Amino acid sequence: WNIYMADYSEAFFLPWKGTAKKISYAASLGAVNKIDDTNAENIKKWLKDFNMVSVREDSGANTLEKLTDKKIQVTLDPTLLLSTSDWNRITGVRMINKPYIFYYSWAYPDEKMNELVHRFAKEKNLEVYVINSSRWYKYRPEKFEFTLYNESGPIVFLNLMKYAEYVFV
């Protein structure tokens, strides 16, 4: 529910009418401290039909309670509900069979960060793997010699994160 994310969408608030209950579990507004008037009105309208709302951060709960007449619960990030053995089972066997750096960015527009990762990789003599192909093609960070891992999804993300020598986010 972070209004500053590139893929922010009304669809995340289930705006269609229907008879099903609308419940959020551990939504995140990110580090948003202030919501402009237009977004505030939209969020207020979209949350009106929710039966229950929970978020991950106290700040998000405070923000949403000010916009709505709802009691907003703060709940644990769902990634923290699994044990190490659960995560190991999910991630599976190593997908890249050599040492590497995993760099995850939601957009790759940060030239300074890209350059930092590139220099670090050169120092360590390691290849840098990235995912998030839609952003890759928009920002074209090939000049930094990053390798786009062609598969994607939660399991790929977790696997690349788990087995990397170094991770940059």
Residue ranges and their predicted role:
Residues 24-31, 63-64, 105, 112-153:
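Catalytic donor nucleotide-activated moiety binding site of glycosyltransferases and closely related
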Residues 76-82, 133, 151-156:
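Short, acidic/turn-prone active-site loops that include or flank metal/cofactor-
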Residues 158-169:
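A donor-sugar binding/catalytic signature common to diverse glycosyltransferases
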Residues 26-107:
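A nucleotide-sugar donor-handling region in carbohydrate enzymes
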Residues 1-45, 114:
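Aromatic- and Gly/Pro-rich donor/ligand-binding loops
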